[in-house]
């Protein structure tokens, strides 16, 4: 299984731009399977557009080593090469004392060659020191190459090459990307702008990234390095049941998917389908009513940017308010379930109001415990998730909660998962993953 990790020396060095460009360039001749390390749900949408294969998350906080390998192996079948974008800097994880949640952790678990990506502005000899430090910090890692980003010109690149090769003749210099503001992509408070927004413009940008990578990097060298991968074993007993609970249910789940709601882990959909669910996508922004279903799944996104249009779609609001099945909303979906977002009327199914703030309100890996059986979990079971939001809930009237947050923030007083009296509606800030919460899919797919 050919595989390679594109790892940054830090955040903001151009990982998504260049990783997506590599995926796009390789896809012209190869069937490329993309991955994102960490809990990000926006970057994978860029990978998916570049390769036409759904990008998957690999995360050593949500998953143990065997689960990381199992997820990788099930999606790498019949693929020519697997390209894995890292998270933050190579060694950043949840702790300063170990590599859990880091790019390094997943790279070692997969025995994958690593290509370092470095912002080389104003660097020459220091680049050699950075590479030497990264290689010596953990000798179990297989750091094979380096890409320089934002170089000034050919003279700058030649000095970089001379310095790096003088101190480390084994490192492969894959190439360099010039400084060009035209290669950048718009960002906002939760990260990159998701691909469902202004999709045509973003597709043109991805084409530009792919063409730039072809011109500036040695693509064949990347393929050659990926061919040096060591194989690894996956326990044949480690089937889906050890990734997530599987019950043969028979339900229809309507998933909100449009410009306002698109933060999802695609493996969650696989897990739901393996539990017998039939998934239908719909748009709270543009559709008239929710499709025929047993359960509504409202994922995260940017409902605050589309609050007026959401509020004005009265037929959809009435359709969801009158729905008599189960409804699960997380983060943006939770906001939609409340009385209002910044004063714009919403579903009024959870008695609270969502307001945006200038500062991050929750940004953390999450550990939690279910206080009761609910539509996404089982009493006393623990789960791992992720939260990242600038909104908060106010005017929280008497509400019941289904889970306690032991690491992270939740909605209020370390509680999350506001639950309706009949238990059919749950809304929380934690983004659930089907491996971090192995009961998620089995419970949500029940009729």
Swiss-Prot record:
GO terms classed as biological process: cobalamin biosynthetic process; methanogenesis
Function: Catalyzes the ATP-dependent amidation of the two carboxylate groups at positions a and c of cobyrinate, using either L-glutamine or ammonia as the nitrogen source. Involved in the biosynthesis of the unique nickel-containing tetrapyrrole coenzyme F430, the prosthetic group of methyl-coenzyme M reductase (MCR), which plays a key role in methanogenesis and anaerobic methane oxidation. Catalyzes the ATP-dependent amidation of the two carboxylate groups at positions a and c of Ni-sirohydrochlorin, using L-glutamine or ammonia as the nitrogen source.
UniProt keywords, alphabetically: ATP-binding, Cobalamin biosynthesis, Glutamine amidotransferase, Ligase, Magnesium, Methanogenesis, Nucleotide-binding
Site (Increases nucleophilicity of active site Cys): 431
Alphabetized PANTHER family for the sequence: COBYRINATE A,C-DIAMIDE SYNTHASE
Note: The a and c carboxylates of cobyrinate and Ni-sirohydrochlorin are activated for nucleophilic attack via formation of a phosphorylated intermediate by ATP. CbiA catalyzes first the amidation of the c-carboxylate, and then that of the a-carboxylate.
UniProt domain comment: Comprises of two domains. The C-terminal domain contains the binding site for glutamine and catalyzes the hydrolysis of this substrate to glutamate and ammonia. The N-terminal domain is anticipated to bind ATP, and cobyrinate or Ni-sirohydrochlorin, and catalyzes the ultimate synthesis of the diamide product. The ammonia produced via the glutaminase domain is probably translocated to the adjacent domain via a molecular tunnel, where it reacts with an activated intermediate.
Record-linked InterPro entries: CbiA/CobB_synth (IPR004484), Class_I_gatase-like (IPR029062), CobQ/CobB/MinD/ParA_Nub-bd_dom (IPR002586), GATase_3 (IPR011698), P-loop_NTPase (IPR027417)
Gene: cbiA
Family in the record: Belongs to the CobB/CbiA family.
UniProt keyword Electron transport, yes or no: no
Residues at the active site: 331 (nucleophile)
Name this polypeptide is given: Cobyrinate a,c-diamide synthase
Domain GATase cobBQ-type: 252-439
GO molecular function: ATP binding; cobyrinic acid a,c-diamide synthase activity
CDD domains: CobB_N (cd05388), GATase1_CobB (cd03130)
Pfam families: CbiA, GATase_3
Catalytic activity: cob(II)yrinate + 2 L-glutamine + 2 ATP + 2 H2O = cob(II)yrinate a,c diamide + 2 L-glutamate + 2 ADP + 2 phosphate + 2 H(+); Ni-sirohydrochlorin + 2 L-glutamine + 2 ATP + 2 H2O = Ni-sirohydrochlorin a,c-diamide + 2 L-glutamate + 2 ADP + 2 phosphate + 2 H(+)
Cofactor(s) listed in the protein's UniProt record: Mg(2+)
EC number per UniProt: 6.3.5.11, 6.3.5.12
Pathway membership, UniProt: Cofactor biosynthesis; adenosylcobalamin biosynthesis; cob(II)yrinate a,c-diamide from sirohydrochlorin (anaerobic route): step 10/10
Species this chain originates from: Methanococcus maripaludis (strain C5 / ATCC BAA-1333)
Domain of life, source organism: Archaea
EC class (word): ligase
């Amino acid at each position: 299984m050919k595989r390679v990790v594109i790892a940054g020396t830090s955040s903001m060095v151009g990982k998504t731009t260049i990783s997506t460009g590599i995926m796009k360039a390789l896809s012209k001749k190869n069937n490329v399977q993309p991955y994102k390390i960490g809990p990000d749900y926006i970057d994978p949408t860029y990978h998916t557009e570049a390769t036409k294969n759904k990008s998957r998350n690999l995360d050593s906080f949500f998953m143990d080593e065997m689960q990381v390998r199992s997820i990788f192996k099930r999606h790498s079948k019949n693929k020519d090469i697997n390209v894995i974008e890292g998270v933050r800097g190579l060694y950043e994880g949840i702790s300063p004392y170990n590599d859990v949640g880091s790019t390094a952790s997943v790279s070692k678990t997969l025995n994958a060659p690593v290509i370092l990506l470095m912002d080389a502005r104003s660097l020459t000899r220091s680049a050699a020191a950075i590479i030497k430090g990264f290689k010596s910090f953990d000798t179990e890692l297989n750091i094979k190459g380096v890409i320089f980003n934002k170089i000034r010109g050919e003279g700058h690149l030649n000095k970089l090459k001379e310095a790096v090769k003088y101190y480390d003749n084994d490192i492969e210099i894959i190439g360099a990307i010039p400084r060009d503001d035209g290669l950048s992509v718009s960002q906002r408070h939760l990260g990159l702008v998701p691909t469902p927004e202004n999709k045509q413009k973003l597709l043109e940008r991805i084409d530009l990234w792919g063409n730039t990578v072809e011109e500036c990097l040695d693509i064949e060298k990347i393929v050659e390095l990926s061919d040096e991968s060591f194989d690894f074993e996956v326990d044949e007993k480690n089937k889906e049941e050890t990734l997530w609970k599987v019950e043969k249910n028979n339900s229809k789940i309507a998933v909100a998917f449009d410009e306002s709601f698109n933060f999802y882990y695609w493996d969650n959909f696989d897990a739901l389908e393996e539990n017998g669910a039939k998934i239908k996508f719909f748009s709270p922004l543009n559709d008239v009513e929710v499709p025929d279903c047993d359960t509504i799944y409202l994922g995260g996104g940017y409902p605050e940017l589309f609050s007026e249009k959401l509020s004005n779609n009265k037929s959809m609001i009435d359709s969801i308010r009158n729905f008599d099945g189960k409804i699960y909303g997380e983060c943006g979906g939770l906001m939609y379930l409340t009385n209002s977002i910044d004063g714009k009327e919403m579903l009024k199914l959870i008695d609270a109001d969502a307001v945006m703030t200038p500062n991050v309100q929750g940004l953390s890996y999450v550990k939690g415990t279910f206080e009761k059986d609910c539509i996404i979990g089982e009493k006393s079971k623990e789960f791992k998730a992720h939260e990242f939001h600038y909104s908060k809930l106010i005017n929280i009237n008497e509400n019941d909660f289904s889970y306690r947050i032991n690491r992270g923030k939740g909605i209020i007083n370390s509680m999350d998962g506001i639950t309706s009296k009949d238990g059919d509606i749950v809304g929380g800030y934690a983004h659930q993953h089907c491996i971090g919460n192995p009961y998620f899919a089995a419970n949500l797919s029940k009729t």
